[in-house]
Amino acid sequence: GYGAQMAEITVDTELGLLKINKITAAHDLGKTINPLLAEGQIEGGIAQGIGFALMEEYIPSKTENLHDYLIPSIGDVPEIESILIEKNDPEGPFGARGLGEHVLIPTAPAIMNALRNATGAIITKLPALPDRILEAIEISKNGSK
């Protein structure tokens, strides 16, 4: 399927903290068989994408458990507006398309594009941790290190 997402964020440029205020997600799922489950799938994929974008970093011997390897909780997930685009798929069951991984994929780019639009910062390594955000903001203001 096809999809697009937009993130609305607030950035604390002194601390490098990024807060997601809202994500708008439009996804083509063919014929929507169960709208409530489709919206839940979109919300879950976005939560995973937030983790990829801002939190989850595997460091051998340091982040090998869920105490040290951070994943999003309900407090990290912003308001989500889901737009279900329906265009029957002649190949899919009852005209439906799959709605899985392609929800996760555009989340990190949407957040990073919002960060760049707000601050000029270009993040080259995920997750976008506060120190990486501060460094990218500094580079955007003054050129390379």
Residue ranges of each PLM-predicted region?
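C-terminal catalytic domains of large/alpha subunits in multi-subunit enzymes
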Residues: 1-145
